[in-house]
């Protein structure tokens, strides 16, 4: 999914650990043991747009930022082989999905490496605000001054070239005086914010629009029609399954119950899971969040629960993905 997408939908059988495999695909790198704490330089943290922009000013050293520091997975070749075997009908590991504990033991960063990262953060004035059981991510917060010192960079403020706002970004790639390899640091910039790709267009009310034959009022389409179009004749309803949705906005529960009533669908239990503080005020993109929930119910009317993982925009994607994998609820 593109960086501009507002959400990700993950649907998978209860108890399986496919979400950890998703993280594997996103974060696989071969760990290289190093001796002394030589300075390592990371890559991919400076937005390309800053190459042609001049900083408006430097961020205040007293301002706080939340960061998610990611460690690489281990045994990359073994993980690739295991992924292939899981989807190979001829393999003895076909559909033999790993538990969270198994995945962490075989491929997750080691406990000593995770503790070394925690010690590095605390030594450099950063506060650990969340740890993850799979040890893939460490969430920290700190002042801009401490972040600049820890990662040997300057946090600058720029005028966004396409949006009516400013954004912050580092002036150089972060580097760390740390012996263990680090994969990525999320949260150093807010140049690209997740947003929906839909575009609202005004309707010319003087023109008589004749909708196609949907099952809704006046022939309008409902989610049920997509189920009939894409999986006609299926008896599968997702009975007893749970679904996890990744969202950067909230929704109004009354919108969902109204849709269920009007579409003749059952009332599905919704469980909100706040990440990085969650959504305190429902925003302008609530319609897309509601649409995702309604589409899941329409396509899988027997679904037992929908877990809605909500995080403020912006928040590190990896925070939500790691939480979903570690919860292992859907």
What residues fall within each predicted segment?
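Short intrinsically disordered, low-complexity coil segments enriched in acidic
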Residues: 1-2, 330
